[in-house]
Amino acid sequence: MMQRCLRLPKLLALRRDLHLAQVERQAVVTEAPEAEPQDAFERQYFKERIEISPFQRVFLAAGSSIAALLDPRRHDMIACLGETTGEDALWTILDSMQASEEGQRIMADKPRIHTSTIDFKYLETLPPDTFGAAYVKFLKDNQVTPDSRMAVRFLEEPKLAYLMTRYRECHDLIHTVLDMPTNMLGEVSVKWVEALNTGLPMCYGGAVFGAVRLRPKQRRAYLKHYLPWALENGKRTKPLMPVYWEKRWEQNIHDLRSELGITVLNKA
């Protein structure tokens, strides 16, 4: 009994030392400076990022959702809504990127899709049944440009900011591989596929509330053909965010669709 009593102060002192050591380690981690940006995207993003509080995030999410509903042409509000409501979905997307070799390369390279980064003259020389040629045709037919996407501003984590940027810049590529135009019927259908594929809340909002703006004839076609097609493809298609589209320009577009599990809607 005497030996146990003599050991007790030593044990208490040991526990105290271990506790102090743990506190010191936590203090070192807490006081460590923020890691330096690792690449050009992160360096630029930290310069342009707008820091907001949790309250401001909720306020922006509510305000942008109302503004987007009142005027769907407010792309700035739609972009704000995507950033203030999509963080959980973006973390899930990041997991899928890291689980894929192709996705890992995207996160390492952080490619951008602009007229300054894509050789469109080269894409125009590709055979018409390639993905690159189909993309150029889509841009011309719908009179759109890859330079029209808004910059991400409100996400704290730069990796998530890149994923949101990547989602926006790949939107027209998704249209291309799905063979959907940019009219309201096509946009709503693509939004359903994107919603089910990415889990982003703004995509669900665009799909649900965008359908309200369809004209009667469009709504009948939507309910009979487009919606069932979009739901089926959204559930069946492989994750689209980890696809390194820029490495697929020369791939036969029919083979690409088959690989991803995409079927094209017969619009006849």
Swiss-Prot record:
In which pathway is this protein known to take part? Cofactor biosynthesis; ubiquinone biosynthesis
**Superkingdom classification of source:** Eukaryota
Q: In this entry, which stretches build a coiled coil?
A: none
**What EC class does the entry list?**
lyase
EC number assigned by the record: 4.1.1.130
Q: Name one GO biological process term.
A: ubiquinone biosynthetic process
Q: Can you tell me where the transmembrane regions are?
A: none
InterPro entries in the record, alphabetically?
Coq4, Coq4_euk
- Which annotated residues bind Zn(2+)? 171-172, 175, 187
Cofactor(s) the record lists? Zn(2+)
Q: How does it sit in the membrane?
A: Peripheral membrane protein
The protein's annotated catalytic reaction(s) are: a 4-hydroxy-3-methoxy-5-(all-trans-polyprenyl)benzoate + H(+) = a 2-methoxy-6-(all-trans-polyprenyl)phenol + CO2
Alphabetically sorted, this entry's keywords are:
Lyase, Membrane, Metal-binding, Mitochondrion, Mitochondrion inner membrane, Ubiquinone biosynthesis, Zinc
Location within or outside the cell: Mitochondrion inner membrane
* Pfam families the record matches: Coq4
Q: Does the keyword Membrane apply?
A: yes
Q: Which GO terms describe its cellular component?
A: extrinsic component of mitochondrial inner membrane
Query: What other note does the entry give for this protein?
Result: This protein may be expected to contain an N-terminal transit peptide but none has been predicted.
Family in the record? Belongs to the COQ4 family.
Q: How does it assemble?
A: Component of a multi-subunit COQ enzyme complex.
Could you tell me which PANTHER family the record lists for this protein?
UBIQUINONE BIOSYNTHESIS PROTEIN, UBIQUINONE BIOSYNTHESIS PROTEIN COQ4 HOMOLOG, MITOCHONDRIAL
Stated role: Lyase that catalyzes the C1-decarboxylation of 4-hydroxy-3-methoxy-5-(all-trans-polyprenyl)benzoic acid into 2-methoxy-6-(all-trans-polyprenyl)phenol during ubiquinone biosynthesis.
State the protein's name: Ubiquinone biosynthesis protein COQ4 homolog, mitochondrial
Organism in which the protein naturally occurs: Drosophila erecta (Fruit fly)
